[in-house]
């Protein structure tokens, strides 16, 4: 099959917004206008196109959100047909890994702002992420029909609060109830949408006389921004005082792709005004896959490799989201960076080092899904029934393996016990948790050997709340949740030498005999976490028993002698011991090693480590004193403040155990006007009084 849309006509975009800015309505309207102008034809092979939404409503599960394909030829059909893949960006920036991944899958972004609320604290976080990954973007100021809407104020906020070099492409005609349309400053024409057909049709008109001078002023700023793209244009601009429409668009595109400017559009998605003009801006100014640098990865020999957006290169794709569908199983959404793959082909999962067969491949369109036979560079699609693929895995050609995303998932810092409410829930819960863990690699599940409880662990209270909520909504599993438990660690502070461990049972029959002498010493926290050095000389312990000594110690690390928490940052040097020709065995040396380790650990000044979170609070200036006072009561170390006119950002390091319930407390202190984010930072030694209480509580269990 030949390529139907040239890759230069692709736009892989994310729509990202603060909660109240109207992201959902904007996305719906995009699908409405593109879906109406492009009816999906009869699906090849006579397979019926299945109505996806109906199933979704029955199941209460949103599958369409990960990525949707739409087609757009421009408001006036002025372009060749472009293919726009809209990728959902996670609403929650707490999970950096998710935001990071969606930023990798996008080529460009549309930032949606509310014309009343403007730039909110959460908008800053998403903006910083987009800066970090160099994502070109345009802005859409939505809700121009709302009371208090002010387009130019929001444009100014993007400039002052986010540091964006903004260029207004449009001006609104009226605002609030009187918002009737927009002025296109490139064409210098007013656009009015027809309310009778939900804005499907529109007319170009002359600019209202009372707006003419303001439009001319803004147009001059726009042309100057375009002229700065090159010296030739600058000269032409100085001589003629203007540039052609074509020159303006080409120059602005060049500057957007270089990350130098942010074009801004406006409208009201709810009132069906301005969305098509914003789609035109997506085509005019945001990059095709061929406009962005080749994606980098790691080859099999650990050297750096890359893949260009071309069908000719070896196949490489990134699995960026796994959606669970109770009927078809796993849907793995993936972005193809290079090459071509057909349904039925076998690919290589370079992260898990396993082969997978691509069965059915589907693409989502507005509210339909279409089975397709092949995908090519630049495409975004979903595969049904891949068995072992996890979020962030690379799928590639078997003869050209590459890893596109080095996934180093942070270790979970908080755990809770979950208990199914009924026997029926018990069976479903295991399945549900397994599926959710496959989707989200920063979430873990295990069974506590002592209590038999199921323990779930994740990156914070909110993270686990969302998991439990999804378990109830998507899998219909009701469960009781225990109190949050913090994942502490144990380590040592001083070195101890020549500690022996002897396991000897020699009373009749075959005995057991193992004897080791070790040194135990602390390792740097940045290091490997554990090292084992064998310095046995002269065969005092035969070589075949050395791995058993290492294993005996490693088994002790899972549950430390102090309070049963994992032990880290320790090194062991095995340098002496003895054995018995008949009675020595692997088991005997394993037991001897564990005895030596326990004895050495007790003498090596053992300490308890607690997880410290990096906390960032954004609050209006009036509440700074209350917020800092409250953080200090939580044993926080406040590292500094940054103030802008509207918001003060407080950076602090706080023990996780003190952060439970913080969201509620912060809301009540600041009348709901502050927000915070936190992420794991490091482990630090817990104060003696805190450690003593924790150890006591563990022993009482």
Curated annotation (Swiss-Prot):
Function per UniProt: Catalyzes the GTP-dependent ribosomal translocation step during translation elongation. During this step, the ribosome changes from the pre-translocational (PRE) to the post-translocational (POST) state as the newly formed A-site-bound peptidyl-tRNA and P-site-bound deacylated tRNA move to the P and E sites, respectively. Catalyzes the coordinated movement of the two tRNA molecules, the mRNA and conformational changes in the ribosome.
Subcellular location: Cytoplasm
Amino-acid positions noted as binding GTP in the UniProt annotation, renumbered to this chain: 17-24, 88-92, 142-145
Record has Protein biosynthesis as a keyword: yes
InterPro entries: EFG_II, EFG_III, EFG_III/V, EFG_IV, EFG_V, EFG_V-like, EFTu-like_2, G_TR_CS
Main localization category: cytoplasm
Family under the similarity heading: Belongs to the TRAFAC class translation factor GTPase superfamily. Classic translation factor GTPase family. EF-G/EF-2 subfamily.
Keywords: Cytoplasm, Elongation factor, GTP-binding, Nucleotide-binding, Protein biosynthesis
Gene Ontology BP annotations: ribosome disassembly
Matches recorded under Gene3D superfamilies: 3.30.230.10, 3.30.70.240, Elongation Factor G (Translational Gtpase), domain 3, P-loop containing nucleotide triphosphate hydrolases, Translation factors
Name used for this protein in its record: Elongation factor G
Entry-linked HAMAP family: EF_G_EF_2_B
The keyword RNA-binding is assigned to this record: no
Cellular component terms (Gene Ontology): cytoplasm
Origin: domain of life: Bacteria
SUPFAM superfamilies in alphabetical order: EF-G C-terminal domain-like, P-loop containing nucleoside triphosphate hydrolases, Ribosomal protein S5 domain 2-like, Translation proteins
Pfam family, one: EFG_III
Signal peptide: none
Domain called tr-type G: residue spans: 8-290
One of the record's GO molecular function terms: GTPase activity
């Amino acid at each position: 099959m030949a390529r139907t849309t040239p890759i230069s006509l692709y736009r892989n975009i994310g729509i990202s917004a603060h909660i109240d800015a109207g992201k959902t309505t904007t996305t719906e309207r995009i699908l409405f206008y593109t879906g109406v102008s492009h009816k999906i034809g009869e699906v090849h092979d006579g397979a019926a196109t299945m109505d996806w939404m109906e199933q979704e409503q029955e199941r209460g599960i949103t599958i369409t959100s990960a990525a949707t394909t739409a087609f757009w030829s421009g408001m006036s059909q002025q372009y060749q047909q472009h293919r726009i893949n809209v990728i959902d960006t996670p609403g929650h920036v707490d999970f950096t890994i998710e935001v990071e991944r969606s930023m990798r899958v996008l080529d460009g972004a549309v930032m949606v702002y509310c014309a009343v609320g403007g730039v909110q604290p959460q908008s800053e976080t998403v903006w910083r992420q987009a800066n970090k990954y160099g994502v070109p973007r345009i802005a859409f100021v939505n809700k121009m029909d709302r009371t208090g809407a002010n387009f130019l104020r929001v444009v100014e906020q993007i400039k002052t609060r986010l540091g964006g070099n903004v260029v207004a492409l449009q001006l609104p005609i009226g605002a609030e109830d009187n918002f009737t349309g927009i002025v296109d400053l490139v064409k210098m024409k007013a656009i009015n949408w027809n309310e009778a057909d939900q804005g499907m049709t529109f007319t170009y008109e002359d600019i209202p006389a009372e707006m003419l001078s303001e439009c001319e002023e803004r147009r001059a700023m726009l042309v100057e921004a375009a002229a700065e793209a090159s010296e030739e244009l600058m000269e032409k601009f100085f001589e003629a005082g203007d540039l052609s429409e074509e020159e303006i668009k080409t120059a602005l595109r060049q500057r957007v792709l270089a990350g130098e400017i942010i074009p801004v559009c406006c409208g009201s998605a709810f009132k069906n005004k301005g969305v098509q003009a914003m789609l035109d801006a997506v085509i005019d100014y945001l990059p095709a896959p061929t406009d962005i640098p080749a994606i980098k990865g790691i080859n099999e020999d650990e050297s750096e490799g890359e893949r260009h957006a071309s069908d000719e290169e070896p196949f490489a794709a990134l699995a960026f989201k796994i959606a669970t569908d109770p009927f078809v199983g796993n849907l793995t959404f993936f972005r193809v960076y290079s090459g071509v793959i057909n349904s039925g082909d076998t690919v290589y999962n370079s992260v898990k080092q396993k082969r997978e067969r691509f069965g059915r491949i589907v693409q989502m369109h507005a509210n339909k899904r279409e089975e397709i036979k092949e995908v090519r560079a630049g495409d975004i699609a979903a595969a049904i029934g891949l068995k072992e693929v996890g979020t962030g895995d690379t799928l590639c050609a078997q003869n050209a393996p590459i890893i596109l995303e080095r996934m180093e998932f942070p270790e979970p810092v908080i755990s809770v016990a979950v208990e199914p409410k009924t026997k029926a829930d018990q069976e479903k819960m295991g399945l549900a948790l397994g599926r959710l863990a496959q989707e989200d690699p920063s979430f873990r599940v295990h069974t506590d050997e002592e209590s038999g409880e199921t323990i779930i662990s994740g990156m914070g209270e909110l993270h686990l709340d969302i998991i439990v909520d999804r378990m109830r909504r998507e899998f219909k599993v009701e469960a009781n949740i225990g109190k949050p438990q913090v994942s502490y660690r144990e380590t040592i502070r001083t070195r101890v030498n020549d500690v022996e461990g002897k396991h000897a049972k020699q009373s009749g029959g075959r005995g057991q005999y193992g004897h080791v002498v070790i040194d135990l010493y602390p390792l740097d926290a940045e290091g490997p976490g554990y090292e084992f050095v064998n310095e046995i000389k002269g065969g005092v312990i035969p070589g075949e028993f050395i791995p058993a000594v290492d294993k005996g110690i490693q088994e002790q690390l899972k549950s430390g002698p102090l309070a049963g928490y994992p032990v880290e940052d320790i090194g062991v040097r095995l340098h002496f011991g003895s054995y018995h020709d008949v009675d020595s065995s692997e088991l005997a040396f394993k037991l001897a090693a564990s005895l030596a380790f326990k004895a050495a650990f007790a003498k090596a000044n053992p300490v308890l480590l607690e997880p410290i979170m990096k906390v960032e609070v954004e609050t209006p200036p009036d509440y700074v004193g209350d917020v800092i006072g409250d953080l200090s009561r939580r044993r926080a170390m406040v590292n500094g403040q940054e103030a802008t006119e509207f918001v003060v950002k407080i950076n602090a390091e706080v023990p996780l155990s003190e952060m439970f319930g913080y969201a509620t407390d912060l809301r009540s202190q600041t009348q709901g006007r502050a927000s915070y984010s936190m992420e794991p930072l490091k482990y630090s030694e817990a104060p003696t009084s805190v450690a003593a209480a924790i150890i006591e509580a563990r022993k009482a269990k």
